[in-house]
């Protein structure tokens, strides 16, 4: 974290630097004009994590500033949502005078939504007993007078929930409301409004598609749910169990009837498609019945392994969302042999950082 860079007055200049940098990285590829999707300049981040510093009777949130090589007190945090910033002082005011709740508390995590829900996770270097549980329930009741809040207590091999360990986000995507179950301690897109822009871009680039869609690394179904409208059927894979459970929840609450989620890794699915191995998790699913002309991938920072790249090359159209331009470039070296980039986008998910979220749409040459 570099607090000095978090200046709304310099946001446009920083975004322009990212645009230039991304275009320069892609100079070896024939790309169309870069579409740039900006972020709000403040209060854009829907989740935040803070360490807690104890100083006598005082206690406060802090982060580590790499530029200063020191901890920095954070009574407020410009990137965090307005809801998180409202909760921060209210929560500290409750914790400070309460010995049971503050003792050995070392971290607080917040997960908020654009729809007004907030989840607070209190992390401890001690086991949580019945007395702590009683105080935590009272804390929730007091905060609930002002906030739509739930609380989690975490310690080694302990997780106590009052009353939910998830939030339900509501996003307006092209004028339609989509709801997403987001569970504590699992991946969700941090920048809610930029996430909407990413969904709308993905819907736009696939709007004239035919047949079915295959998605690898689908998470909680973030893109699958939104893209289901453009395809006859959607088949999606995800390895993390909490994300798969959230995806199934999201299918139900959004009343999607053409989306099937499979819990398996992209690598295993690649083997299944190549008929190298059989998997019990695929029983009852006829992969050959799918007519997938389009594939959507949003891989981890490491990008796709060579076998998955080869699998992806077998599809007419590829939508690739990347959180790491360098591994995207590595994958595009192979993908560009068979496909041409016809759409190219930069999504500013993480303002005031060097991080660049990008998207490419490729079509077979």
Curated annotation (Swiss-Prot):
GO molecular function: rRNA binding; tRNA (uracil(54)-C5)-methyltransferase activity, S-adenosyl methionine-dependent; tRNA binding
Gene3D superfamilies: 2.40.50.1070, Vaccinia Virus protein VP39 (3.40.50.150)
Binding residues for S-adenosyl-L-methionine: 189, 217, 222, 238, 298
Matching CDD domains: AdoMet_MTases (cd02440)
UniProt superkingdom: Bacteria
The entry's keywords: Methyltransferase, S-adenosyl-L-methionine, Transferase, tRNA processing
A GO cellular-component term linked to this record: cytosol
InterPro entries, per the entry: MeTrfase_TrmA_AS, MeTrfase_TrmA_CS, SAM-dependent_MTases_sf, TrmA_MeTrfase, U5_MeTrfase_fam
Biological process, per Gene Ontology: tRNA methylation
Protein family according to the UniProt entry: Belongs to the class I-like SAM-binding methyltransferase superfamily. RNA M5U methyltransferase family. TrmA subfamily.
Function: Dual-specificity methyltransferase that catalyzes the formation of 5-methyluridine at position 54 (m5U54) in all tRNAs, and that of position 341 (m5U341) in tmRNA (transfer-mRNA).
Protein name: tRNA/tmRNA (uracil-C(5))-methyltransferase
Gene from which the chain derives: trmA
């Amino acid at each position: 974290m570099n607090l000095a860079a978090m200046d709304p007055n310099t946001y446009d200049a920083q975004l322009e630097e990212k645009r230039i940098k991304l275009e320069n990285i892609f100079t070896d590829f024939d790309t169309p004009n870069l579409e740039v999707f900006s972020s709000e300049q403040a209060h854009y981040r829907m989740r935040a994590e803070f360490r807690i510093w104890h100083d006598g009777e005082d206690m406060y949130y802090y982060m580590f500033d790499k530029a200063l090589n020191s901890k920095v007190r954070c009574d407020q945090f410009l990137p965090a949502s307005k809801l998180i910033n409202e909760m921060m002082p209210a929560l500290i005011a409750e914790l400070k005078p309460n010995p049971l709740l503050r003792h050995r508390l070392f971290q607080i995590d917040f997960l908020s939504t654009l729809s007004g829900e907030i989840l607070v996770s209190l992390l401890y270097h001690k086991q949580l007993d019945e007395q702590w549980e009683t105080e935590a329930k009272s804390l929730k009741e007091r905060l609930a007078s002002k906030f739509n809040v739930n609380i989690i207590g975490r310690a080694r091999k302990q997780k106590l929930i009052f009353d939910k360990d998830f939030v339900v986000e509501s996003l307006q995507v092209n004028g339609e409301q989509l709801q997403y179950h987001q569970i504590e301690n699992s991946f969700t897109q941090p920048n809610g409004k930029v996430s909407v822009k990413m969904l709308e871009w993905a819907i736009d680039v696939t709007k004239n598609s035919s047949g079915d869609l295959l998605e690898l690394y689908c998470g909680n179904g973030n893109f699958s749910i939104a893209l289901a409208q453009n395809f006859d059927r959607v088949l999606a894979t995800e390895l993390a169990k909490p994300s798969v459970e959230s995806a199934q929840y999201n299918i139900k609450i959004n009343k999607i009837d053409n989306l099937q989620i499979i819990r398996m890794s992209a690598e295993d699915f690649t083997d299944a498609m190549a008929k190298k191995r059989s998997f019990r998790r695929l029983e009852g699913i006829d992969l050959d019945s799918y007519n997938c002309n389009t594939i959507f991938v949003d891989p981890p920072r490491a990008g796709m392994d060579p076998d998955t790249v080869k699998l992806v090359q077998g599809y007419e159209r590829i939508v690739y969302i990347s959180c790491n331009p360098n591994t995207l470039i590595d994958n595009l070296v192979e993908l560009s042999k068979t496909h041409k980039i016809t759409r190219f986008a930069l999504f500013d998910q993480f303002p005031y950082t060097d991080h660049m979220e990008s998207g490419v749409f490729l079509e077979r040459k």
